[in-house]
From Swiss-Prot:
Component of the MTV complex, composed of moi/modigliani, tea and ver/verrocchio. Interacts (via C-terminus) with moi/modigliani and ver/verrocchio; the interactions are direct and require fully intact moi/modigliani and ver/verrocchio. The MTV complex is recruited to telomeres by the HipHop-HOAP complex, consisting of HipHop, cav/HOAP and Su(var)205/HP1 to form the terminin telomere-capping complex. The lineage of its organism: Eukaryota, Metazoa, Ecdysozoa, Arthropoda, Hexapoda. This is Protein telomere ends associated. The keyword Manganese does not apply. Residues 442-456, 467-477, 505-516, 783-793, 1681-1691 have a biased composition (Basic and acidic residues). Residues 333-385, 441-519, 779-810, 1098-1178, 1629-1650, 1679-1699 are annotated as: Disordered. The gene is tea. Transmembrane segments: none annotated.
Length: 1876
């Protein structure tokens, strides 16, 4: 029955007990291990796929026994009787197979498998128990017949219908419909029944069956099985679509939406292919979708068209599957297993053809090319998904999980029989194919070695059980390590490889017989796992020759891992030995995994490490040394990227990487590596930049230096890509450093456009005169190409692969190969995309289009003209080959001139082009060639002007590209051969010279002037000042610039007279002047625009040098070639950052070594070093003095830090405060002065700058904070920011150059320019100009226009975890001096909430200037008031003067008569100077204009306010009316005459009056005077003493001698009027209009009747002193936001009335609905909390609360009595309890979106408060006063029923002003008609 018995199976399988334990653990039942062992024994032969899930270990045994143990029985090996016997054996043996017993139509499942070839194999049950319910066959419409475990009726009996309906219904209405409609309900249940068993993987984890059912749950959870071909197709399609989704293939729905012509393709399929004629549209579309990814050949037959989409999504749409997955799916799908013959009409061209293909094929043996493997002969056995999930499923889901994967088995009986018939026909090549499976059969199934379940390899069966012993032995001798078991399955190895000790013991115990040696070798080789699939994510998917464990086992692991660890900076020997001895260490595993991936995916790693394999078998060694095989395009690109860089070097010699030394074949470099490293100053920066590239990312520093050294002397490419700077050295040494080896020496100097991009530091002109001919700065970034020397050995004939598709066509050899052509064309991708848009190339792939272009390029000039190409920088020899034609097209070379205009290189290699043209010896007349050269010269000059690519990232490095004239000189070999051609040819090539335009004339004149000697000439432009003043219309600025230019010219020896005189007279060509305007037409735009933008640029104007004996000339714009030297200093903007100004001065000092633009300079020779150094020192000194002058210039209030702090809010205010409290070290580190960095080098100057900024509070124009260090500064001060948000930061602290470098500010500039002018910015210089202009606007308005830039460099947002803020040393610094009280008197500090828009300022008590001697970071005492030092009679707030506007304000609290220098219009009169006391035994009624006084009876006199037994009736005698009139503002200002003249007017004293009647009269006669025409918006501040200069009236209060109330409190003022602070910020027009309206139109409104209430009754309400309304009014007068007004009972006079427009200036709103978003409460503030939450105002230790509410869908921060305002419905007891809980917590923070009440870890008190605030009603009437129109901050006020709303609007209007006259006439006519 089975190959071996169960007893033999137990002996041979070593880990059988472990497998049985694992099965028992996974199922969790009560069966024994013996039963599970027997079950596994049966399944081992019945279902071979279980071997992959549970790998076995075979004990040492003879080979024949091992083969017999592992073989797979034949399909007919187990008879039906055996099946019946097994079924009768009971559960202890093996499970009973599924038997269909329902009716006569049902047969056993095994018979069904024979009759229906679609069913492959027998399903496996996980639990060996019999089934109690028979299986049924169900025909599902359009899906085929399936075998379900239970019938539909049984399923309905076992299902919980209500639970099911909750899962599947869409709504309650849908559920009711199902319950009421029986037919619909049954139909829905039937569909669910079908889906439940057809698609078991889509089941919900919820158990929908009843708890008690007759059918076991395992039976109910079984999955259905397909019965016919249609069902198999349905399951296969579902599996295929799942597999496509797993492999990142788009779904079918997405495919249909994005395939534009899918309907056309389906129609073509139905018309052209008979297989799809009978199918409907949906089926054809699904077949095309599956074939599109599984059989990609269909893409070539039916041309597809995608809808517009992104490149990433397009790549996803066009991706393909791996060969193994596609082959598996192709076999499982019937419609794709045998595709239509039409698909074979066009075979796709493979994309794996590379130049390294030959080397790969050379590693194979000679017999490997004869292997013919048919894909249909291979059977890929996939491990069962159900078994892989066996251990993770629950017991009730175990059976369903195992059975649901039956369709995954793909081994059919017919395939096995085919292998049996052809087994004896295998030859030696078949054995070799088994030895080298990766090369012979690449399409076989492969498994990844990453997952433990798939670590073992499953191979295709190549050897049958009855194969001869000789063949097996021969196979074992050839490649025992890759031997494939004859049963078709390799013995899977264990998860960990065998240790060497165990293998040694096994080899020692084995006898020396050949058979036994072979057997032991088999056991030894079981751990050699080959051909594993590895996914490297973005680098692609590969097939590696061996697994990671096998690789680690054979390679010299200890040496490799030591080298890797040392390279990663692990130097400690103890740590190294510890890591090396532990391969399982995560760090070692990570590094070795990376080495393993790079070893096979990249070739350069093998050259950098000395590896060796401990493998005696040569075939195993060859397998270990193989390369990886790419499986997708990313992998192919990864391998080609490394192969292309090393292709030529590998062809010369295959040697490991060693530092190259001087050999006979390679000429020695001019200097050694050590000397090179000593002379290069920026070598570390170059190494860092190179290591950012993929090519050098994994190399060490020394290796990168070696590569740069070799590339530096191999060609100009490395010098251009990575610019180097040499240290100061003699000119001889410079020439030696810049020279090339003898082999390459003649190339770079003769090619002026391939010269070296290097600079030197501090080189003199004399030492650099010779090197200047070889050194030119290139501004254009050129990508790295192959060294020039690599291309010299490339043959000019094409490779055999260039026309492989047309072997029969005779085609002449092309000049270069296709691969070389592709590597030198820079825009090949763009050409291919443009060609694919044409009709003739539309259906072709990219490779085919490139091949067609390659052929057309060398077939004639048509292709070159139609699609212009650009070549990368290369030598003239290579360029000649690229532009030449094949032999038969030599006559077409006459078109070469046209090709020169289109096939341009990225760096203009004009000399190379001309040299290649001249070598063809074309007969051209001299005049024609000269005309051609002149035209070419003019064209190149135009291109230099107009076609410059603008870079926004490195604008500071922009430099106009030089145009060397000698590149277009007529070659001598062409001119000397003229006249030797036939006369006919000369006549044909004769070219007539056209009329020269002005550009050509200028270019020719420029060339003529450049070739002449000019001694002692000074070039001065006649319109120089016009260009200097371009864009500046201010005469003052123009005069300033002209004066600066004159001063600079005089200091440097220039003669200014010629320049100024040239403005009026036209220049004449003479020995002293040249027409620069006409000559410089062909000049680059950079020079003109730089001269234009020299507003204050004395540095940009170089001086002329004295002529010498040798021929010399001057450089007019010597310093204009680099924008780093452009110093555009505006009067209102800052300038370059330290990054741009911190460059080495090598560009200035070695300025004469640069080859500049023609027409902008004339070369100078013989200038002395001393003269240049003195000039440079003068320039630097002038710039330094200029920067110092700007820095210490007198600035306006916008440049004052105190003003900026007062007018800023939020984060910006915090930053200004931080900058205001910097210390000296922080100031020098975080800030920078434009053009004044040298000021920081001197200690004296640094202290001066520090005192000017920090001590005196100035912020100069040219001072900025370094943007890269801003986050570090904030972090060190305790301000935690995840990202820098520039919208919350003022533009004043940044530099425009840093904004252009680190943000998208340049993009905003470009967009704003386009929006304003409709044109794009042409060059970088224009961009710099516009950047300065826009930044100046942002500076002037102190805000970003039109939008705030975003940080583009993410390095600025990097985390700063190591920098911890030092809170202990942070002290908040005072802005203004606060009046000090008596030192002996205790000071009470009251916290006053502040808003961002208003700041309470105090006038300094010092006579001249502020005394700012506090420590940095000291707390801002601006918002805190000393209550004990406040005069009680001075509580009426005066009009506050901004301390930043007037610095001469003086005050004193000791002498009332002290004058101060504030304008008279800003002063207010104070009231009663003596203390106010309460009346005694008197009460007054102010119901009219006069006060009526009444005596209090003796029995009513004694009132004990401290008594708790006082009640309302006992206090009714003290009732006074609480008036509720509108807020009145009484400004007593001086006349406008005094306000304008600022005269000192002495105040006349008003005699005191104790008459109460006179007091009432005086109060009612107060009037508001007209406000001045120019009203200054000021900020209210604390009450000051009355000024003696004020000529105003005083309020007369009560007599001091009246009877007093007897109580224990301090006497309180009862008649003081507190001015509302909000009215002080009214606009001028509104204030004036209000005053006028109050004078002309008095309002006589009757007083509002209120219930009389006495002061004692008000005191009794709160029972606390602080809740007293009168005292609270006095306290609130100091607050800038919460000012209250005492109410009066008498009617106000007309002069004191306020217009309704006053409400608009002080926005107030009555709110009845709000959403509480945030609420915070702090019982006692700490310094850390103030800094962390940016709390403004309160001192440490004060109580603080704030809320964020949403009113009318807008968020507002509110302050004030929050608890009583937000929760007015609370009783006094509940409110006190709430306050008690908050004080008990100490700190509480509520957020509505945070469900803290559900978190059990949160404090219970906080959870209760969260629930309370969540459930609090949102309807809560209260009033809120907003700080300004933005309504971001406000103060809440409890809303009273009697209060009159302040935001009433006047609804009256004039209809005639709003309605048109014709409409009014129509209304009147209609009214007349209606009346009549």
């Amino acid at each position: 029955m089975y190959p071996v018995s169960f007893a033999a199976f137990q002996k041979l399988i070593v880990n059988l007990s472990e497998i049985a334990s694992e099965l028992k653990t996974a199922n969790g039942d009560n069966r024994t291990l013996v039963e599970w062992s027997r079950w596994y024994y049966k399944e081992f032969y019945r279902n071979p796929s279980i071997r992959a899930r549970f790998p076995v270990k075979v004990a040492p045994c003879p080979r024949r026994t091992r083969d017999n143990l592992l073989k797979v029985p034949e399909p007919g090996g187990i008879s039906q009787n055996d099946v019946a016997n097994v079924a009768a054996a009971g559960p202890s043996q093996v499970e009973q197979p599924e038997v269909l017993v329902e009716g006569s139509q049902l047969t056993t499942l095994a018979e069904t498998a024979k009759s229906h070839d679609a069913v492959e194999g027998v399903a496996v049950e996980c639990k060996p128990s019999g089934s109690e319910s028979p299986d049924v066959i169900v025909n599902v419409e359009r899906c085929g017949a399936f075998i379900f475990p239970v019938s539909f009726d049984v399923f309905l009996q076992c299902i919980n219908k209500m639970l099911l309906f909750k899962k599947i219904v869409r709504s309650i209405e849908h559920c009711l419909v199902l319950l009421s409609d029986d037919e619909r309900r049954l139909l829905t249940l039937q569909r669910f029944y079908n889906r439940f068993y057809m698609y078991p993987e889509k089941r919900s984890p919820t158990n929908i069956f009843n708890a008690t059912t007759e059918i076991p749950l395992e039976k109910l959870l079984e999955s259905g099985k397909p019965l016919d071909k249609k069902a198999v197709k349905t399951v296969a399609e579902l599996t295929a679509m799942k597999s496509l989704t797993k492999n990142s293939i788009v779904s079918f729905e997405v495919f249909k939406k994005n395939m534009a012509n899918l309907s056309d393709i389906v129609e073509q399929m139905r018309q052209l292919d008979a297989n799809y004629a009978s199918k409907d549209v949906q089926e054809c579309a699904l077949d095309y979708y599956l074939a599109f990814y599984i059989t990609p050949r269909i893409r070539y037959k039916y041309a597809y068209k995608l809808k517009p989409c992104t490149s990433t999504f397009k790549a996803c749409m066009l991706s393909i599957l791996g060969k193994d997955i596609a082959e598996k799916l192709r076999k499982s799908l019937p419609q794709l297993a045998n595709p239509s013959p039409g698909l074979d009409s066009r075979r796709p061209n493979t994309s794996y053809i590379t130049e390294s293909k030959g080397s790969l094929g050379s590693q194979n043996t000679s017999g490997s090319s004869q292997i013919q493997t048919s894909p249909s002969m291979e059977v890929a056995h996939e491990p069962s998904e159900g078994l892989s999930q066996l251990a993770t499923l629950s017991p009730e889901n175990c059976a369903a999980g195992a059975i649901s994967t039956t369709e995954g088995l793909s081994s059919s009986h017919n395939t096995l029989e085919t292998f049996e018939n052809q087994a004896n026909l295998r030859n030696d090549a078949n054995k070799l194919s088994r030895c080298m499976p990766a090369l012979a059969s690449p399409e076989r199934h492969l498994h990844s070695s990453k997952a433990p379940e798939k670590s073992s390899e499953v191979l295709s069966p190549q050897v049958k059980p009855h194969q001869s012993k000789e063949v097996a032995e021969e196979q074992s001798d050839r490649a025992p390590q890759l031997e494939i078991p004859p049963s078709g399955f390799e013995v899977p190895m264990s998860k960990t490889p065998e240790s060497p000790a165990s293998k040694t013991r096994a080899s020692d115990e084995t006898p020396a017989k050949p058979e036994e040696i072979t057997d032991s070798t088999d056991v030894y080789e079981t751990s050699f796992v080959t051909d594993v699939e590895v996914d490297l994510k973005k680098h692609g998917r590969f097939i590696f020759p061996v697994s990671l464990e096998t690789f680690r086992q054979y390679i010299n692991y200890d040496e490799i891992i030591r080298a890797i660890l040392v390279n990663n900076h692990i130097k400690d020997e103890h740590q190294l030995s510890k890591l090396i001895s532990d391969p399982s260490h995560p760090q070692c595993k990570k590094f070795f995994r990376q080495f393993y991936n790079k070893f096979y995916a990249r070739n350069d790693v093998r050259q950098r490490f000395k590896y060796k394999f401990n493998c005696p078998n040569p075939k195993m060694l060859a397998k270990l040394k193989q390369k990886a095989k790419p499986l997708d395009e990313k992998a192919l690109f990864t391998m080609n990227r490394t192969d292309n860089a090393k292709a030529v070097n590998e062809s010369k010699s295959q040697v490991p990487f060693t530092p190259k030394t001087t050999t006979e074949n390679c000429p020695p470099n001019p200097i050694s590596l050590e000397m090179f490293k000593r002379h290069v100053s920026n070598l570390d920066d170059i190494v860092n930049e190179m290591q950012k590239c993929d090519e050098y990312k994994e190399k060490s520093k020394e290796e990168v230096i070696q590569d740069y050294y070799e590339g530096f002397y191999s060609g100009p490419d490395m010098r251009e890509k990575f610019e180097c700077r040499f240290k100061p050295c003699p000119s001889k040494k410079i020439r030696q450093l810049l020279s090339f080896p003898p082999k390459n020496k003649e190339l770079p100097p003769k090619n002026p456009n391939c010269q070296v991009a290097c600079t030197t530091e501090n080189l003199s002109d004399e030492s650099c005169l010779q090197s200047s001919r070889n050194v030119v700065r290139e501004t254009q970034n050129i990508t790295e190409e192959k060294p020039i020397a690599e291309h010299e050995s490339i043959p000019s004939t094409r490779t055999p692969s260039s026309n492989d598709d047309k072997p029969g066509e005779e085609c002449p050899p092309y000049p270069v190969s296709l691969e070389l052509f592709k590597s030198h064309v820079s825009n090949l991708d763009d050409i291919a995309n443009n060609m694919q848009k044409c009709v003739e190339y539309r259906g072709k792939s990219k490779d085919e289009v490139i091949r067609d272009y390659y052929k057309g390029f060398y077939s004639g000039p048509e292709m070159r003209e139609k699609f212009a190409c650009r070549f990368k920088p290369c030598t003239g020899h290579i360029l000649q080959q690229l532009l030449s034609y094949p032999g038969k097209n030599v006559n077409d070379c006459l078109q070469e001139t046209d090709c020169l205009a289109t096939c341009t290189t990225r760096t203009p290699l004009k000399e190379s082009c001309l040299q290649s043209k001249s070598e063809m010896s074309l007969p051209v007349r001299r005049n024609a060639l000269e005309i051609l050269m002149k035209r070419k010269r003019t064209k190149v000059a135009k291109e230099a002007i107009s076609s410059k690519p603008m870079t926004t990232q490195n604008t500071s490095q922009f430099q106009p590209e030089p145009f060397p004239e000698d590149a277009l000189v007529v070659p001598e070999d062409v001119t000397t051969n003229q006249g030797t051609q036939p006369l006919e040819l000369q006549h044909e090539l004769e070219v007539t010279e056209p009329i020269k335009d002005y550009i050509q004339l200028n270019a020719e004149r420029l060339y003529e002037l450049s070739s002449k000697l000019k001694i002692g000439w000074n070039y001065t432009a006649h319109n120089f000042l016009d260009k200097l003043f371009k864009g500046i219309n201010c005469p003052v600025t123009q005069a300033f610039l002209e004066e600066q230019y004159k001063r600079y010219s005089v200091s440097t020896g220039h003669i200014v007279a010629n320049t100024i005189a040239a403005e009026e007279n036209e220049p004449q060509l003479s020995s002293n002047s040249v027409d620069i305007e006409s000559v410089c037409t062909a000049q680059t735009t950079a020079t003109d625009t730089q001269a234009t933008e020299m507003h204050t640029i004395p540095k940009a104007l170089d001086q002329s040098s004295e002529p010498t004996k040798e021929s010399s000339s001057v450089n007019l714009n010597n310093n204009l070639e680099s924008p780093a030297k452009i110093k555009m200093i505006h009067a209102e903007s800052s300038n370059n950052s330290r990054n741009s100004t911190n460059r080495p001065n090598t560009e200035i000092e070695a300025g004469s070594t640069k080859i500049l633009e023609d027409g902008a300079r004339v070369t100078t020779e013989g200038n002395s070093e001393n003269e240049n150094s003195s000039v440079e020192k003068k320039e630097n000194q002038f710039l330094l003095e200029r920067a110092k002058e700007i820095f210490f210039a007198e600035g306006s209030k916008d440049h004052n830090l105190k003003y900026l702090i007062c007018t800023s809010e939020g984060l910006m205010r915090t930053i200004w405060r931080i900058l205001y409290q910097l210390d000296l070290q922080e100031f020098s580190y975080y800030t920078s002065i434009h053009d004044g960095e040298d000021l920081y080098k001197s200690e004296d100057n640094l202290h001066l700058c520090f005192r000017h900024v920090v001590d005196h509070g100035n912020w100069p124009v040219n001072l900025c904070v370094l943007l890269p260090r801003l986050k570090h500064l904030l972090h060190s001060k305790g301000v935690q920011l995840d990202r820098l948000n520039l919208s919350k930061i003022s533009p004043k602290i940044f530099s425009p150059w840093e904004l252009g470098t680190y943000s998208d500010f340049d993009q905003i500039v470009a967009q704003e320019y386009i929006h304003r002018t409709g044109e794009e910015i042409e060059d970088v210089v224009k961009l710099c100009q516009e950047r300065e202009k826009l930044y100046a606007c942002c500076w002037a308005h102190n805000q970003w226009l039109p939008r705030a830039p975003q940080i583009a460099n993410e390095t600025l947002n990097a985390e700063l975890g190591e920098v911890e803020p030092v809170i202990e040393r942070i002290l908040l610094k005072k802005i203004c001096g606060v009046k000090d009280g008596d030192e002996n008197k205790p000071t009470e500090i009251v916290s006053i909430p502040s808003s961002p828009s208003t700041v309470c300022s105090r006038i300094s008590t010092q006579p001249a200037e502020d005394k700012l001697s506090q420590q940095p970071s000291q707390l801002n005492s601006l918002n805190f008031v000393d209550v004990t030092g406040v005069e009680l009679a001075s509580q009426v707030p005066q009009m506050v003067v901004d301390p930043l506007v007037s610095n001469q304000i003086e005050e004193t609290s000791q002498v009332p008569e002290t004058q101060y220098d504030a304008p008279a219009s800003l002063q207010m009169a104070s009231v009663k100077q003596e203390p106010i006391s309460f009346l005694n035994n008197q009460r007054a009624f102010c119901d009219s204009e006069k006060c009526q006084w009444e005596h209090i009876n003796p029995e009513e006199q004694t009132i004990d306010l401290d008594s708790t037994e006082s009640d309302g009736p006992s206090l009714s005698c003290f009732a006074i009316q609480n008036q509720n009139s509108e807020d009145q503002i009484h400004f007593i200002l001086e006349d406008s005459v005094h306000a304008e003249n600022h005269d000192y007017v002495k105040k006349t004293e008003v005699p005191k009056s104790t008459d109460p009647a006179q007091l009432g009269t005086n109060v009612n006669t107060l009037s508001v005077r007209s406000m001045p025409a120019c009203q200054v918006s000021v900020i209210p501040k604390k009450r000051q003493a009355a000024s003696p200069r004020l000529n105003s009236k005083r309020m007369k209060l009560m007599n001091d001698k009246v009877p007093q109330l007897r109580h224990e409190f301090q006497p309180l003022p009862m008649g003081v009027k507190v001015v509302q602070s909000k009215a002080l910020i009214l606009p001028d027009s509104q204030n004036i209009r209000t005053s006028q309206t109050a004078k002309t139109k008095p309002t006589e409104s009757p007083p509002h009747h209120q219930v009389n209430i006495t002061p004692s009754q008000e005191f009794a309400v709160g029972n606390t002193l602080l809740e007293c309304s009168e005292l609270q009014g006095l306290l609130d007068s100091n607050d800038v936001n919460d000012g209250k007004v005492n109410k009066e009972d008498h009617p106000v006079s007309g002069s004191a009335c306020t217009s309704k427009r006053l409400a608009a200036s002080s926005p107030q709103s009555s709110v009845i609905y709000r959403d509480l978003e945030l609420f915070s409460f702090y019982k006692s503030l700490t310094l850390e909390q103030i800094i962390k939450y940016r709390i403004e105002g309160p001192l440490p230790g004060a109580t603080y609360q704030k809320a964020l509410v949403k009113i009318n869908d807008k968020l507002c921060n509110v302050r004030g009595p929050l608890i009583s305002s937000l929760f007015p419905y609370l009783s006094s007891t509940l409110r006190s309890d709430l306050e008690l809980v908050l004080h008990d917590l100490g700190e509480f923070f509520y957020k509505r979106s945070w469900p803290a009440h559900t978190d059990a870890t949160v404090d219970f008190r906080k959870r209760v408060l969260f629930v309370f605030m969540n459930l609090s009603p949102r309807f809560a009437p209260f009033s809120i006063k907003f700080d300004n129109e933005s309504r971001e901050w406000g103060t809440c006020i409890e809303a009273n029923v009697g209060d009159k709303s302040l935001d009433q609007r006047d609804t009256t209007f004039n209809a005639e002003e709003l309605i048109k006259p014709n409409i009014l006439n129509s209304i009147e006519q209609l009214k007349c008609k209606l009346v009549t």
